[in-house]
Every structure is written in structure tokens, then in C-alpha cells.
Amino acid sequence: MIKSWKPQELSISYHQFTVFQKDSTPPVMDWTDEAIEKGYAAADGAISFEAQRNTKAFILFRLNSSETVNSYEKKVTVPFHVTENGIHIESIMSKRLSFDLPKGDYQLTCWTVPAEMSDLHADTYIIDAVSV
Amino acid sequence: MTTDIIKTILLVIVIIAAAAVGLIKGDFFSADQKTSQTKEYDETMAFPSDRYPETAKHIKDAINEGHSEVCTIDRDGAEERREQSLKDVPSKKGYDRDEWPMAMCKEGGEGASVEYISPADNRGAGSWVGHRLTDYPDGTKVLFTIQ
């Protein structure tokens, strides 16, 4: 299955946004110095990616996409398991975005594209989910 | 007669001593009275200073300086309030800028206290707060205390 969702706006706070299981609550993430160095933190079936700036950003979610990202500032890849169909993405006290990602194992890659490099003229986080 | 006088004197001494202890410990002006004085709130949040000491100190200092200890959740206005509160505080490499009241609170925005905090402390604190508040709707008033 190949799918790309349209970009959705998210207000970033505390330099992070979390990908977590549908119908659950984002867990407390322990942002150790090591996690900050790696650019992500993980807990309870969820992943929080570091965001460069606290501002309005776009989340572009893609499943098994073959499109490449040419201009980006940072790229982080982590394994992720979807326990039931569907995931959410939110930052701290932001609105909640939903994606109907099917149950299964994935490699999640988060590409950080700063506003000056983005066609959307705002910080953009492209998240590629690749089935494994 | 003499016994009654002694009893009365002892009673007065006990009352004065109790009042003095209460004043020293601050009991007369904390907890219940403060709660009823300050404000209305729907929920309370005991923020853990042992886990996020820098952020906790900032919250405590800001409240002592007169900033609100109650946060009225208002997600939609967060972006604008953050711009106002951070406009004169440049970013600094290796630090996050922590705001109190937080940008998601109606009480935040222009004039909010802003402090440079280590990212590990501040981002953990943000995650902790988000975990506890995420299900509260806009308009919920949360009283923060430092534990």
C-alpha cells in the first residue's frame, strides 16, 4: 500500500511532537541528553521526534513512498510498531492529527525541513513510514 | 478563685503559642485560605521538582514574582502568546526558552516570565505536563503547585 496524506498544520511546543497509538495518550518522554543527541525519545509504543523550533509547522505523512526528500536539515529513522489500525500525532497540548496507518511493523523516518527549504514556507516534518 | 485565674492564664498562653506557631509555619495564609482567595480552578497539578528541577524552580520563581499559578487552557491562542512572550528573548544555543505562564494558558503571552532552561529538563517537563493535561478541554482551569 502506498499513500500520502495532505500536509496538516501542527503547533509545536517544547521542541517535540509525538507519534503514538490510536486511542491512547502520549506517554511521558524522558528527554535525556542522549535522546536529544539522537533526535528522538521513545516510550510505551510511542516516539517523540525533536522539533527545531516552537512554531506552526506542517506534518506530511507518507506510507511506502518512493519520493525522495532533497533538501532537509536532519533525518532520523526509528522502528515503530502499530498495534491497532491508526496512529495519532500531536505536540504538547496541540490539536491531535490522525492517520489510518495499518497495523504492522514500520521504519519511521522523520525529515526535518526548515521553512526556508520548504515549499510550504513553514517548518515541515515529513514522516515516511516504510513497511518492514 | 486562684485556680481559675491560673487556668485562664494557661489557656491564653496556649492560644497565643498556637497562633505564633501557625504564623511561623505560614498555615494561616496557605492551603485553604490561599485557595479560596485565588481563584477558581477545576483541576490541580503537583509539578515534580525532583524530576524537573530547573523548570520547577522557574515556575516557583515566576509565581512568587506575581505570575498566575492557574493556567486556563486555550490551545488556539498559544501561537500568538508564544510570539508575544518570546519576542524580546533571543534563542540561545544549548538552551530552551521556558515560559511561565505557558503559551497554552490564557494567562500567558506578553509579560510572561521567560527563562533559559536545559533542553533535557524543559522537554521532559513539557512531555509530563502534556501527558496530564492533554485530555482537558479548552477553558479548564488548572492550579499548579510545586511538589
UniProtKB/Swiss-Prot annotation, chain A:
Q: Which UniProt keywords apply?
A: Cell membrane, Competence, Membrane
Cellular component terms (Gene Ontology): plasma membrane
Cellular location(s): Cell membrane
- One Pfam family per UniProt: ComJ
GO biological process entries: establishment of competence for transformation
Instruction: Report the principal subcellular site.
Output: membrane
InterPro entries found in the cross-reference section: ComJ_sf (IPR038691), Competence_nuclease_inhibitor (IPR020354)
- For whether the record's keyword set contains Disulfide bond, the answer is no
Q: How does it sit in the membrane?
A: Peripheral membrane protein
Record's superkingdom? Bacteria
Nucleus in keyword set: no
Protein role: Plays a role in the competence of cells to be transformed. It inhibits the activity of the DNA-entry nuclease.
Subunit text = This protein is a subunit of a 75 kDa protein complex, which governs binding and entry of donor DNA. The complex is a tetramer of two subunits of the DNA-entry nuclease and two subunits of a competence-specific protein. Only the complex is able to bind ds- and ss-DNA.
Name of this chain's protein: DNA-entry nuclease inhibitor
> What is the protein's species of origin?
Bacillus subtilis (strain 168)
Name of the encoding gene: nin
Swiss-Prot record, chain B:
Q: How does it sit in the membrane?
A: Single-pass membrane protein
Which EC numbers does the record give?
3.-.-.-
Q: Which organism is it from?
A: Bacillus subtilis (strain 168)
Keyword check for Nuclease: yes
What is the similarity comment for this entry?
Answer: To B.subtilis NucB.
What are the TM regions of this chain, as residue ranges? 8-24
Q: Look up the record and name the cofactor or cofactors this protein needs.
A: Mn(2+)
What is the name listed in the Swiss-Prot or TrEMBL entry for this protein? DNA-entry nuclease
Role this protein plays: By degrading DNA that enters the cell, plays a role in the competence of cells to be transformed. Degrades both double-stranded, linear and covalently closed circular DNA.
- Gene from which the chain derives: nucA
GO terms in the biological process aspect are: establishment of competence for transformation
